Curated annotation (Swiss-Prot):
<dbReference type="GO" id="GO:0007601">
    <property type="term" value="P:visual perception"/>
</dbReference>
<feature type="region of interest" description="Disordered">
    <location>
        <begin position="180"/>
        <end position="210"/>
    </location>
</feature>
<comment type="subunit">
    <text>May interact with UPF2. Component of the small ribosomal subunit, ribosomal RNA processing complex (SSU RRP complex).</text>
</comment>
<dbReference type="InterPro" id="IPR002716">
    <property type="entry name" value="PIN_dom"/>
</dbReference>
<feature type="modified residue" description="Phosphoserine">
    <location>
        <position position="350"/>
    </location>
</feature>
<dbReference type="Pfam" id="PF15017">
    <property type="entry name" value="WRNPLPNID"/>
</dbReference>
<feature type="modified residue" description="Phosphoserine">
    <location>
        <position position="323"/>
    </location>
</feature>
<dbReference type="Pfam" id="PF17146">
    <property type="entry name" value="PIN_6"/>
</dbReference>
<keyword id="KW-0378">Hydrolase</keyword>
<comment type="similarity">
    <text>Belongs to the NOB1 family.</text>
</comment>
<feature type="binding site">
    <location>
        <position position="271"/>
    </location>
    <ligand>
        <name>Zn(2+)</name>
    </ligand>
</feature>
<dbReference type="InterPro" id="IPR039907">
    <property type="entry name" value="NOB1"/>
</dbReference>
<dbReference type="Pfam" id="PF08772">
    <property type="entry name" value="Zn_ribbon_NOB1"/>
</dbReference>
<keyword id="KW-0540">Nuclease</keyword>
<dbReference type="GO" id="GO:0004521">
    <property type="term" value="F:RNA endonuclease activity"/>
</dbReference>
<feature type="binding site">
    <location>
        <position position="286"/>
    </location>
    <ligand>
        <name>Zn(2+)</name>
    </ligand>
</feature>
<keyword id="KW-0862">Zinc</keyword>
Amino acid sequence: MAPVEHVVADAGAFLRDAPLQDIGKNIYTIREVVREIRDKATRRRLAVLPYELRFKEPFPEYVRLVTEFSKKTGDYPSLSATDIQVLALTYQLEAEFVGVSHLKKEPEKVKVSSSIQHPETPLHISGFHLPSKSKALQETVDHGPPADGSENLEFSSFMFWRNPLPNIDHELQQLLIDGREEEEEEEEEEEEEDELEDSDDDGGGWITPSNIKQIQHESEQCDIPKDVQVGCVTTDFAMQNVLLQMGLHVLAVNGMLVREARSYILRCHGCFKTTSDMNRVFCGHCGNKTLKKVSVTINDDGTLHMHFSRNPKVLNPRGLRYSLPTPKGGKYAVNPHLTEDQRFPQLRLSHKARQKTNVFAPDYIAGVSPFAENDISSRSAILQVRDSMLGAGRRRLNPNASRKKFVKKR
C-alpha cells in the first residue's frame, strides 16, 4: 500500500491507535485535536510518537468555505468547531499541493431512483446464506406447442371469459385423485430437499479463514489508495460526508480509502417533496410542519440513494393532536410557531437596559450616578430577553435548564 503524501489526522485516529506512519509521509493536525484527547493511554502514546506530528492552523477563508458547504449538506449541526478546522486544513492542503479545480463548490442534488426491490432488502450479506427458490418448479413448466387459430378465436370469444359453471362430478373425481397425488408429491419433495441441501452446502456465501480479509474490506466499502496526495483520517461520519461530497479523500483507520458515506436531507411525508436545506422547519411546497430527516448514501461516482426506515415510531402521530392555547398579544407574547410566515414580536430590551454609560463620550450627560444601571425590574428583564445584537430570540438562556411541564393542582 503506497503511503499518502499528506495526511490530516482527527482525534479518532489517535484514539483508535491508527498506524499513521504507515498511512502517510507527512502527518498534520491542529492543537485543538490534541487538547480534546483526555484518555490516559492515548496521551501516553502521543508523548512517544514514532513520527513527526506537524501542527498547522487553517486559513479563515477555508474555514468559512467548509462551514457554508457543511450547512448545505446538512451536517453542520453534527460538527464541532474542531471538526470544521480539521476539514478546512484538509481543504487547504489539497489547494496547496493539488489544486481546487476538481473540488465541488455545491453538494450533489439527490436523485431518487425507483426500483422494484425494497432498498433495505439485503442482497449479499457476508456470513449469511439466503436460499434460492427451487429450480425444479421452473423445469416442470411446459410451454407446449404454439396456439392455433381456432384456439385464438376461442380465447377472444365470450364463452372463454364467462364464469364457468360448477361441475360436481368432476370435483368428486378430482378429490380422489388429489389424495394419491399428495402422497407422491410429499415423497418427491423430501428427495428434492435433500438434494438442494447437499448442493447448498457446496456453494459459497460463508465466512472462512481464507476469505475473511476480503469480506472485511468489502464490508468497509474501502479501496487501496493509489496516487493520493492529500487525505484525512477520521471516524466521524459527518466529517466523512462533507469530505466525500467536496471531492476530498477520506482514509479509514486502517489506511484504506472510503468509497461511500451517508448524508441527510429533509423529506416531507405529506407531499413527498425533498429539500437539502437542513435549516427549514416547514415544507416549502405544502407549507406543513412535516419534514423528516432521511439518510442518503453518496457513492464514489456522486450518485445518491435515499433510505427509508421501516420503524413505525418514525412517523408516529402521537403528540401531534392537542388543543392550541389562546393567542396572546403584546411585546413579549410567546405563541406557538404554526406557519413559516408567522409574525412575532421583536422582543426588544427596555430603554434602561439599552442605555450605555460612556463618560468620555462628547454628548455624555451626567446623571445621578456615573455607573451603568442594571435593569432587573422591567418586563423584558424578568423574561430574560437578550439584546438583538447578541442573538435575541424566542428561547431560554439555557436550553438544557429544567422546567416544570406538569404541575399538580392541590
